[in-house]
Amino acid sequence: MRWSEIGCTMKSVNIEWNVNLRQAFFCIARALDSVGVDDINHGHRVGYMAYSCAQAMEWSEEECQLVFALGLIHDCGVAQKRDFYRLLENMQPDNTQQHCVRGNELLSNCPPLAPFADAILYHHTPWDELKNIAISDRNKRFAALIFLADRVDYLKELYPRDEYGNVTQEARNQVCLEIGRLSGSLFERDLVRTMQHLLSKEFIWFSMEHHHIEAMGHNLPSTPFFEQKLGVEEIMSIAMLMANVVDAKSQFTFQHSQKVAELCQHLAKELGLNVEMQKALYLTGLVHDIGKLHTPEEILHKPGKLNESEYLCIQRHSTDSRYTLQMVFGQSVVCEWAGNHHERLDGSGYPRGLQGAAIDLPSRIIAIADVFQALTQARPYRGSMSLNEVMNIMRHEVSCGRLDSQVFDVIVRNSQQYYQLSIAESPTEWA
């Protein structure tokens, strides 16, 4: 079956392989901030303080912006709320190594960010240890500064705000005293002196609102790193990083995005779509659920039926995905396809209630891949399903006119291979 034989329109698609690196960092930061809901925008504040301190230290503009970006995503190894809460237990919490190692692995597997992976690995390492570790001077400085900014953000939350929500002068003084006490042991001395000077000014405290930080971040001068033109594989690696952050939020969705991506790619190939379309659908599969990071964990993990309000939270994730991806990928069709993955041919889907020819072939492919993969995975309210169970449910959806019959026929012809691909715990090669 070729796509030209399928009863839906296939408009000419111009796939733009561009990514806004600045927006990608903010996107990941916003996603991570959704994990620690009791300390929202932590990554924004750490990035901003690190950037401000680096500027005051007269680092190059490139390095200032890099440490800002790394500050935004420094906790990319934090998967769930419980991991985040451990970081709030004390000044030197136990078990920080796990999320540092995971963050290092995520960046190491993303070529554009791999040179900075060591800064994430050591961002909770005391200075009296870090100074003797054999990593680049740049990553050592980045790690030391991110650690300092991270702990300043932790310290300020130990003190009550005034009646208008401002950090009190007493709290500011105590923060400066505490980092000064740990200068030379936990923190690098020059960084501490510079940070203390910054914290003595009202400007830095008033600028810690996330909208101020994003406005500043979007208006920074051009630098080579952020203006570079990424290749397709590099863009894929950033999408994979985003997918890993999404999938780690719940043990029930582990590798879901990656598997949907693989299913999409195979379906596109068997339907005769060209290689560029196959890659674009793979990319869409990786990022289709990015909006789910705003969905509360208690809803994702609920073992029973969702009530009306909870279901509304679930429904909004595809819209959140669309707009989040537009900030990173611009007007790429990837954003539209990701936003359509819960649309159904009979108009019963969400969020726009599209039907029939209004749903293009790529959107139909990702809808089927998403349903198929979800059924093969365990969920809080059920175990994983057998191939027969999966196929029976999907046949019902097709017969009711919700999912595309001819795309589904591709799965029918190779159902065992698609099932094995979907349940495998690592990327699957399939000729």
From Swiss-Prot:
CDD domains (alphabetical): HDc
UniProt xrefs under Pfam families: HD, HD_5
Observed phenotype of the null mutant: Significant increase in the ability to colonize the small intestine compared to the wild-type strain. No defect in biofilm formation. Enforced DncV expression in mutant cells lacking this gene causes an enhanced inhibition of chemotaxis. The double mutants lacking both VC_A0681 and VC_A0210 or both VC_A0681 and VC_A0931 show enhanced bacterial infectivity, and the triple one (VC_A0681, VC_A0210 and VC_A0931) has the highest infectivity, which demonstrates that V-cGAPs play non-redundant roles in cGAMP degradation.
GO molecular function: cyclic-nucleotide phosphodiesterase activity; metal ion binding
EC number: 3.1.4.-, 3.1.3.-
Cofactor comment text: Requires a divalent metal cation for activity. Likely has a bi-nuclear metal center. Has the highest enzyme activity with Ca(2+), followed by Mg(2+).
Name used for this protein in its record: 3'3'-cGAMP-specific phosphodiesterase 1
